[in-house]
């Protein structure tokens, strides 16, 4: 099974009860991986939220990924970590989490892309594909052509991130990309289960 296919990234603006409801419903709808992302909270709150998501995922095959924080991933024994370019180096993160955990890395330009295959990572988060309200600091948008180029450049699985919604999913899926990461299309949906089912249906 392709665990990267429909990759939910949580919204750190949502309270704990909403987070739990969204994740539970999204997994029922077919989400294949969940990344808990916290940019504003303290570590204790991050651990609490990560543990709550882990409890929801424990009887499923859906991996739990922690954004940025290796310490939080270790604290809750998550399935993996997703690093940004300004986070801990991938080589050090790999030493800390061990060989069997999933390690992802955000890639924002061609130089980082060419280096990626030499790093001890399992997948790439190609960011940002399109302009997005949740990623205000990205300097480059890859677009469809950039995504196609990246798929030809690296042997690693690619998860497309940034500005992805129902209008561009068919076009993205047609590139053969391994997975699509979404925040608002699922987290802000009235019915996250139905939204996940619908989004999966657009991926042909």
Swiss-Prot record:
It catalyses: 2-[(2R,5Z)-2-carboxy-4-methylthiazol-5(2H)-ylidene]ethyl phosphate + 4-amino-2-methyl-5-(diphosphooxymethyl)pyrimidine + 2 H(+) = thiamine phosphate + CO2 + diphosphate; 2-(2-carboxy-4-methylthiazol-5-yl)ethyl phosphate + 4-amino-2-methyl-5-(diphosphooxymethyl)pyrimidine + 2 H(+) = thiamine phosphate + CO2 + diphosphate; 4-methyl-5-(2-phosphooxyethyl)-thiazole + 4-amino-2-methyl-5-(diphosphooxymethyl)pyrimidine + H(+) = thiamine phosphate + diphosphate. It is an enzyme of class 2 (transferase). The gene is thiE. GO terms for biological process: thiamine biosynthetic process; thiamine diphosphate biosynthetic process. It comes from the Bacteria. Pfam families: TMP-TENI. 4-amino-2-methyl-5-(diphosphooxymethyl)pyrimidine binds at residues 35-39, 67, 106, 135. Its cofactor is Mg(2+). Pathway: Cofactor biosynthesis; thiamine diphosphate biosynthesis; thiamine phosphate from 4-amino-2-methyl-5-diphosphomethylpyrimidine and 4-methyl-5-(2-phosphoethyl)-thiazole: step 1/1. This is Thiamine-phosphate synthase. Belongs to the thiamine-phosphate synthase family.
